[in-house]
């Protein structure tokens, strides 16, 4: 199975619904590094629907920022604990006076630009249809976050959603 032409890696959207949102809405498709919701399993039910779109948006923005800064995804935990580091690093390197909110908007704009390219190229995304119907053992879960709910990822204020 694939999303936007990219094969689904180890994380099944039926058991980690936040990663399913990322696969469907990320400009890169089924790329777990685009916004891996695995770490959210400590703070929210990974098989639940509530909050998954918002969590995916936060993680995708942080992933886009790390990619844009040219740093490895493995340093993300430090940024999750102290997200102001994004602005501090850019300010130190380039002599800017960016706030964390400025940087969040930059990450969001990056994702929206990539998604606009996909739309113009005819690339659309959703999890494979069978994942919405076929239950995954042992919890017998399906991916039940609607396309309409996932589309909200593009209208949620990225700055307000980060805290």
Region spans (language model):
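Extended C-terminal regions of large enzymes
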Residues: 1-163
């Amino acid at each position: 199975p694939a999303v936007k032409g990219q094969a689904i890696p180890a994380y099944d959207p039926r058991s980690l619904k936040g990663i399913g949102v990322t696969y469907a809405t990320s400009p890169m498709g089924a790329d777990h590094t685009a916004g891996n919701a695995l770490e959210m399993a400590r703070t929210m039910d990974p098989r639940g629907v509530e909050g998954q779109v918002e969590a995916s948006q936060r993680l995708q923005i942080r992933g886009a920022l790390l990619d844009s800064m040219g740093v490895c995804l493995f340093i993300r935990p430090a940024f999750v604990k102290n997200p102001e580091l994004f602005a501090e690093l850019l300010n130190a390197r380039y002599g800017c006076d960016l706030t964390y909110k400025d940087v969040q908007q930059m990450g969001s704009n990056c994702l929206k630009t990539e998604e606009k390219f996909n739309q113009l190229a005819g690339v659309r995304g959703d999890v494979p249809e069978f994942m919405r119907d076929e239950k995954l053992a042992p919890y017998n879960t399906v991916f039940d976050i609607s396309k309409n709910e996932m589309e909200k990822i593009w209208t949620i204020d990225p700055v307000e959603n980060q805290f």
